């Protein structure tokens, strides 16, 4: 990681033309400030911090290699049960990337009840694209400055969350997961956080108030999640291809619990499937206990509870396996 002035200088000398022109010019100017004795120590510190952040990001081209649709489908089937329409839309996006070798003009907006796997879809897409991903939770953003950073004229100035996301990803091409987009217009500070998102989504570049350099965003693929589309402004909605995700049916929940949720928990805690057996009546009871809840989050917690109980009985009561019927589940 480049932190010292000398390491940053050496890197810039080696990087040459590999840096975008505007970033190279910006870096030389800030390096001059960081070395200068004619500015305040605070200005030098800010310049060095900004340089360290920018030079530790790999500034990649917006050319994307072809992606195997068959492998993409395998990943989707591995990560998600059902959701055929969602998978079809993602595969269509992959094929479009293969034709143009660039990201689509629009990101994805996934709208559905809580717990229906919206975040899981976003992670699967990042895995398919072989890109780092970062998350932005709009429910915790009260002021646009949290996103854009603060000017270096202030002693406690710092970069914004968006710039931090690029820094943590370590490259300019990434999947930007924006959770709870329907909360974006509810800022309590000065201005509207949604307006900042528009500049990020337009693919025309983004400028952080602390960094003071326009960074390319053509390699950013935004995927947003929301529960209520009526709370999303028309300008924001127009930047996305919208996919509505319905809640799971009871039969789908049965399959998800028995084939995905419970085996996943058992594997994680080192148990074999034959050590924790769920009868058909027990499975019906699990689904019945959670019939009034949307999504599968509560089912995943039920799987945790059943697996933990089975492990307890095996270790404490020294039984070889535990069978859960309807009475035990309830």
Which positions does each model-derived feature cover?
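Short loop/turn elements that form and flank the Walker-type P-loop nucleotide-binding site
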Residues: 103-106, 129, 148, 169-174, ...
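Pre-Walker A (pre-P-loop) alpha-helix and adjacent loop at the N terminus of AAA/AAA+ ATPase modules
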Residues: 25-63, 67-111, 162
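Walker A/P-loop
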Residues: 104-138, 167, 234
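AAA+/SF3 P-loop NTPase mechanochemical coupling elements
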Residues: 169-177, 208-226, 274-278, 323-327
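Conserved C-terminal "switch" segment of AAA+ ATPases
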Residues: 16-25, 61-62, 170, 228-238, ...
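Conserved catalytic/switch belt of AAA+ P-loop NTPases
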Residues: 178-216
């Amino acid at each position: 990681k480049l932190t010292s002035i000398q390491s940053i200088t050496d890197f810039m000398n080696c990087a040459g033309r590999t840096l975008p022109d505007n970033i190279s010019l910006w870096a030389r100017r800030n390096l001059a400030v960081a070395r200068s004795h004619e500015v305040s120590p605070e200005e030098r510190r800010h310049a060095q911090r900004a340089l360290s952040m920018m030079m530790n990001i790999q500034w990649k081209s917006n050319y994307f290699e072809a992606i195997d649709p068959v492998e993409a489908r395998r990943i989707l089937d591995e990560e998600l049960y059902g959701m055929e329409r969602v998978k079809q839309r993602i595969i269509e996006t992959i094929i479009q990337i293969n034709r143009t070798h660039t990201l689509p003009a629009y990101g994805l907006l996934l709208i559905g009840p809580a717990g229906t796997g919206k975040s899981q879809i976003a992670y699967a897409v990042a895995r398919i694209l072989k890109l780092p991903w970062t998350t932005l939770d709009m429910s915790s953003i009260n002021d646009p400055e949290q996103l854009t950073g603060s000017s270096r004229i202030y002693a406690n100035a710092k970069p914004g969350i968006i710039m931090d996301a690029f820094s943590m990803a370590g490259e300019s091409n990434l999947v930007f997961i924006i959770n709870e987009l329907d909360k974006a217009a509810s800022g309590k500070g000065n201005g509207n956080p949604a307006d900042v998102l528009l500049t990020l989504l337009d693919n025309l570049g983004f400028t952080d108030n602390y960094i003071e350099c326009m960074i390319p965003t053509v390699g950013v693929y935004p995927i947003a999640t929301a529960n209520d589309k009526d709370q999303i402004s028309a300008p924001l909605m127009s930047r996305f291809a919208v996919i509505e995700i319905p809640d799971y049916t009871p039969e789908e929940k049965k399959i998800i619990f028995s084939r995905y949720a419970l085996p996943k928990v058992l594997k994680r805690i080192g148990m074999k499937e034959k050590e924790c057996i769920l009868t058909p009546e027990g499975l019906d009871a699990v689904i019945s206990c959670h019939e009034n809840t949307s999504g599968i989050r509560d089912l995943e917690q039920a799987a945790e509870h059943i697996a933990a109980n089975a492990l307890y009985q095996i270790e404490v009561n020294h039984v070889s396996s535990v069978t859960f019927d309807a009475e035990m589940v309830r």
